[in-house]
Structure formats: structure tokens, C-alpha cells
Amino acid sequence: MGIAPVSETENDEAAQRLQSWIALGYNADMAWMANPKRQNIRELLPSARSVIAVGLNYYTPHQRSGDPAHGKISRYAWGRDYHRVLTKKLKALNLWLEQQVPDLQSRYYVDTGPIQEKAWAERAGLGWVGKNGNLISRDYGSWLFLGEIVTNITLQGDRPHSQHCGTCTRCLEACPTQAIVEPFVVDSNKCIAYHTIENRAEILPTAIADNLQGWVAGCDICQDVCPWNQRFAQPTDVADFDPYEGNLNPELETLANITEADWQQQFTASALRRIKPAMLRRNAQANLQ
């Protein structure tokens, strides 16, 4: 956990980077990324003075089988929906704050509002935004779910984290679709994670379909090759993030024919519910072709 003060010039550099990214069309069809509130936190809470940023480790030491008959699901979605897990914890923290501060005004988010989570986490000292666009912690690598409490309390800020990617370019070199177009800049139009999770089209672009390498839900390539993850990843103590049965090594043939009923049963409390049955079938079928 860390704290970032909200200043009058509040995160101007991050807002400018976001504007440039959107102007280049790198958000693909994720129109919500252009919400003006994302560039000014006082649009979310006019009285905002501090952001309490939190990170929750979700790494589990389980490994995929490597069998080409199996699909690959990103680690973040192996277990229980992180929105539910972390929101419950933030709600408890916010309730405690309300008990300490009678006039508390606050909003809390877990990937649920127009807030630049990684930028605020960096300012709060949790880590730095790496060349692959993920927040990297010296203690846990990039296997962190992020959340924030925006509040009207004036709190002592933590030291913003410096950047420690150095000259490393492993993530850029490993991406099969060259989605990391330059250090720290990801073009969603080329990103496997974007297309398998957010793209609602009936058919994936050829450049994506030809390079899926088994991925059906997200993609961890740029994280798996990161030296910080290889050296410092630690098993989480949150049992909710242990893989559900069928999420670690799902059979491509099964996913290619998944029904609405099967989808409802398998992904009841999973972040994978964002990927509808038709999308899962599409992703699996593209891997089988």
C-alpha cells in the first residue's frame, strides 16, 4: 500500500501520455479509455486530496502443461474474480477510514472506474510502469491487482517509485505481434490480450490469429519473460487466486465448442465472464486452425 497526494497539477504528465496514446488510436475500440474523468481525478471526487493505492499479489506457482492441445489463460483469471476479492478488502479499509474520520469523503475502485491506476500506483511508491505497460514491483514483479481509495483526507505521501527496466528489452522482443511498439507504449490493436478479451468481432485479425500460440484468454508473454517476475515473483497467500479446475490447462477442443450452459457453470465467479461464449469459441477455433 502507498499514498499519493493529489496536487493542483495532478499527474499532468500521465494525462499527457494518455492523450497521446489515444490520439494514436492505440486504445482500439476501448472508447472508455478516452473518458475525460480519467485525466482529472477531481472529476471523480472534487474534494480529493489523497489517493491510497494498493496492490494485491496474485501469483501462484502453477505452470501450464505446454501441451498444444491445451489453451492458455492468463494468470489473472485462473481463480476467483479479482474485482470481487479486492473490492471486498477495499470496502473494509474504507469502512475503517469512515470510523476514524467522521467527515470522510471517498470513492474506491478496482478496475471499475475512470482512473489511471498504474500512474497513481507509481506515484504512491508501489512500483514503476515497465516497458510492457504493466506496473512492476521490486517485491512481487508485475503480478499485482491494483485498487485505489480516493479520499478528501490529507495524508503524507510516499516517495514515487523510480524506473528500473534499464536497458532490458525482453518484453519487446518476445511479443509475437510486436504490440509493444516502443518502450512503455502498447498498441492494443496488435495485442493478443486485447483481442482475446475485448474484441467482440466474429473473426480475429489474421495477424493475431496466426500468432496466438495457444492463448484464448489474455496473454502473459511480456510478463513471463520479465526478469523482475522471474526473480522476485512470490506465491500469493490469497487462496481465492488458486486456479479453478479447468482454468489452468483447458482443452482447446472443449472451448471451441463451449455452450452457454457450460460457460455459465465453469465461469460463475471468474473474471473470464467478460469473455462471452462466442468469443471463447472464436479464440479456441483460431488456435486449432
Swiss-Prot record:
Domain of life: Bacteria
Reactions catalysed according to its record: epoxyqueuosine(34) in tRNA + AH2 = queuosine(34) in tRNA + A + H2O
InterPro entries per UniProt: 4Fe4S_Fe-S-bd, 4Fe4S_Fe_S_CS, QueG, QueG_DUF1730
Binding locations of [4Fe-4S] cluster 1: 165, 168, 171, 226
Keyword Repeat: no
Enzyme Commission code(s) on record: 1.17.99.6
Positions of the catalytic residues: 111 (proton donor)
MF GO annotations: 4 iron, 4 sulfur cluster binding; epoxyqueuosine reductase activity; metal ion binding
Residues engaged in binding [4Fe-4S] cluster 2: 175, 191, 219, 222
Obligatory cofactor(s): cob(II)alamin; [4Fe-4S] cluster
Keyword terms of this UniProt record: 4Fe-4S, Cytoplasm, Iron, Iron-sulfur, Metal-binding, Oxidoreductase, Queuosine biosynthesis, tRNA processing
Enzyme class: oxidoreductase
Family the entry assigns: Belongs to the QueG family.
Function description: Catalyzes the conversion of epoxyqueuosine (oQ) to queuosine (Q), which is a hypermodified base found in the wobble positions of tRNA(Asp), tRNA(Asn), tRNA(His) and tRNA(Tyr).
Protein name as annotated: Epoxyqueuosine reductase
Organism of this sequence: Synechocystis sp. (strain ATCC 27184 / PCC 6803 / Kazusa)
